[in-house]
């Protein structure tokens, strides 16, 4: 619906303006709005960019987001049987721009699919990604933790 899309774009622009003014990164969850999302992010030209959270798009969108400074965060969806395009993204995202999440309480990773998702399942996602990328769990955990702290500097004090 055009009115709804226009309202969402206006609201998103306000959020992006707030991020620019405060110097904070943005956390973006986008569905079925790929072109609009990328256009608005490019237009905003944020100095601190942010993260495309619970990413479910293809490598083309991931590459476009990476090119403007964004991180890509993968959830339990990457473990789903029908998520081959997302696994390709997981293989290609530079390790210094990768984040891992659960998106609780939904989208529990295999082997917990069909149950409520819990924050502790982030380890399952990270273990899956480590195998997929051919690195140890420890390496992946260390790198994604460093990425998180770089993107959200205040997390260093916690």
What are these regions (language model features)?
Residues 107-109:
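Amphipathic alpha-helical segments at domain termini/boundaries
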Residues 30, 54, 70, 77-78, ...:
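Active-site metal-binding loops of divalent metal-dependent hydrolases
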Residues 96-104:
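Non-cysteine beta-strand/loop elements that form the S-adenosyl-L-methionine
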Residues 121-158:
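Mid-to-C-terminal alpha-helical segments outside catalytic/metal-binding sites
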Residues 1-68, 88-89, 93, 111-120, ...:
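Divalent metal-binding pocket/active-site signature
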Residues 35-36, 81-82, 146:
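Short secondary-structure capping/turn micro-motifs that flank functional sites
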Residues 72-88:
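Active-site glycine- and acidic-residue-rich loops that bind
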